[in-house]
Amino acid sequence: MNKRKKLPIGIESFEEMRKEDFYYVDKTRWIEQLLAQWGKVNLFTRPRRFGKSLNMSMLQTFFEVGADASLFDGLYISQNKEICEQYLGKFPVVSISLKGVNGNTFDEARSCLVKVINREARRLQNLSESEKLTQVDKELFEKLLSPTMEDGTLSSSLLELSELLEKHYEEKVIVLIDEYDVPLAKANENGYYDEMVLLIRNVFENVLKTNHSLKFAVLTGCLRVAKESIFTGLNNFKVYSITDVDFDENFGFTDDEVKELLHYYGQDTHYETVKEWYDGYRFGNVDVYCPWDVINYCSDHIANQSLAPKNYWVNTSGNDVIHRFINSISEPQKLTKLELENLVNGGSVQKEISQDMTYKELYSSIDNLWSTLFMTGYLTSRGNTDGNRYDLVIPNREIRNIITEHILKLFKEDIKQDGQKVNAFCDALLTEKADVAEKLFSDYMQKTISVRDTFVQKPTKENFYHGILLGILGFKENWLVTSNRESGDGFSDIMIRVGDSEVGIVIEVKYANDGNLEAECKKALKQIDDTGYAEALYQDGIHKVLKYAIACYKKNCKIMLETEKC
C-alpha cells in the first residue's frame, strides 16, 4: 500500500504543503475566478480556521516572479494553460499578514506592524542590489528595513515597496494582506482603537487607493469593517462575505471534499459523525465544513478509531463574543433568552444582519451581537427572508456544545453570588426534603437555557442538567462531590460525602423525553439499586445513603427519594 500523505494540521504555507507531501484540498480555482471577476481591491471575509491564510499563500506562490510551476501540477488551475502562461510566476508580490499586530498599548502594536514591514522588506532584499533603482530609491528601501520607522515612512511603506518592485521588474504589483482586521480587533480590546484605525487607514489608503503600481489587491479577514472606517474613498472595492454566492466554495471544505478526504484516510464510516459535528456553515449557496475540525478529527481517529468527537474550533479563540452575548441577556431581554433557547434546541431566529459595523459597534447592542455571532461563525444562515434579514441557526453540534458550555459557565457564576440559596438546596437534600429541593431546583432551571432539541440524544440532554446540578453542589462547603465515579457495577451520576457525617448521597439524573417525570424517577431509583451505586459509600464508612432520582423535562423537574441504611 502506498504511503499516505500527511495531514496538514496548522500548515499555512502552500509551498510547504506541496513540497512536503501534505494532503491538499484543491482550491486553485479561486485563481481563475479572481481573474475572471477582476476587482482592483478584493476583500474576503470568513470565520477563523476556514483556510484564508493557506489560500493567500497559494496566490503568492502562483503569481510571484520565480514561481515553481511544478507545485501546481495536477491541480485545477494547471488545466487552464492560458492563465498559467499569462500569470504564473509573472508578477512581483507584496504579501503580509497582520495576524501578529497586537499589543497592550498602541506603541506595542505599532512596533509589531513595523516588524511586519521589516520582514517583508528583508524578503525582497534583492531590491537593494537592483541596477534599475536609483540611490534615492535604495535609501528609501533601507528605511523600510529600519526598526525605528517614522510615521510617514510606515504609512507609505506598502506603497513604496510596490513602486520599487514595479521599477525593478517593470510589472505592476499584486498586494496580499492577510488577517487585515486583527490589529483593529486587538486595538478595540485594549483601548487604542481610534489610533489604530488612523494608522491602518493611512497604510491602506496609500497602497490601495493612490498606488499606480498596483495590479490588484486581495485582503482577508474575519469581519467586514465599515468602509468609512479604513477603506475611505476606495472606488473599485469589492467585498465577498459569507452571504455572497461568488467564491462560495473557495473557503472551507465542501461535502464532496470531505467524503474524498475521509475515504483517502479510511475513515468513511465516520462521515455522519463529521457531518453532524462540523458541517452546516452556509457560505453563499454552499454548505461547508470547517477544515480545521475535519483535519484534526481525521488525525485523531487514524490513531484511535473509538475516540469521541471533540470541540477543536473552540481552542483557537477565547470565544469572547459568546461570553458577551450570553452575559448580556438579563431580565429586560427575556425575548433574547427565549430566542437563544430556541437556537440551542435546534430552532431558528430571524434577524436583521449588519455587515458594515466598526469594531467599536460589534458589542454595543443585542442587535449588533446577533450580527457578530453570524459573521464569526457561531450562527449561520438558512436563507434570507427579506433584504438583510436572515434565518439564523446554530450550524452544528460543536458550536452548540460551545454555546451550552458558556451557558453553564455563566450559570455557575450566578450561583456563586447566592450562597444562601445553595445552602437551602443542599440542606433540603441532606434533611430528606425532596419537595423543597424540587422547588429550588425548578427555580434554578427557570433562570437558564433548557436543552430539549429533538436532534440531541438523550444522554446529551441529561449531561446538561447534570452540569446544572454540579454547578450548584460544587459551591457547598465541606461536601465532597464526585461525578460519574466508578461504583458497584457501573457509574453513578453524582456521589456526595457530607463532611464528617455518616450520611452519603447518590443522585441519578434522567431526561424524560415524553414528559413523564415520575416514571423516569422510578427508573433512576431502580438503576441506583440494580447497579449498587451506594456500595462505594458504605465502603467509605457511610451508614446511611440518601438515593435521589432527579428527572427533567424542559424547565420542569421531579425529585424522588429513597433511603437505605447499612
Where are these regions (language model features)?
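Structural signature of nuclease core domains in nucleic-acid processing machines
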Residues: 434-566
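Phosphate-binding site recognition
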Residues: 1-461, 476-478
